[in-house]
Amino acid sequence: MIFHPPLLFLGYGGFVIPSCLALAQALSRRQADEAAWTDVARPFTLAAWAMLTAGIVLGGWWAYMELGWGGYWAWDPVENASLIPWLIATAALHTMLIQTRRNKLHGVNVFLMALTTISAFFATYLVRSGVVQSVHAFGSGGVGVPLLLFILISVALSFWIALLARRSDTGELAGIESREGFLILTSWLLLALFADHPYRHHVARVQRLLERDRHGPRPRRRPRRGRT
């Protein structure tokens, strides 16, 4: 347990460096550095990915061996949230190879790297907002709505910057049967797994809120008085 939280936070924080490199390069509009930033960012991404992987694995081992929860992974909402940056970073590592070899997917890589860091804030939102019931959740403290607004604005700005980076896509992608094609398919699969968790979680929450508004709040039961 002593290594589990630090490794997770080192993994989350480590993604900030390649994310800043990607966004800075896209905003600078320097064509000479279009491919160079991936060479600089890849070691940082791999290091952060490795630390996050170790943190997730140690957390599963600790839950099974020490807490006796009966499994390594309970599909807890906060546990799944820690997996989201790992999935996006894995997809980004695949698409970085395509940018280096084919001079394509510049905008995709910029957006994925930014989304990796933003997804770490999404995990914080789940823990601190009080919107989920989890053994990892804490009191909200009023940070849920501001943090959610920050996440939405960051996603919108990152998407706009990624559109600017698409101007450097001068190469051609190979067919689906090629190695690059399989890398793209793998990346799409990882992103689909990433999108599934927040979509299902928030849709289910909206449905519960609608049901509550339709039927009204449940009446509170009065405590029974003991016999005298």
Regions flagged by a language model, labelled:
Residues 1-228:
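Polytopic transmembrane helical bundles with strong interfacial aromatic enrichment
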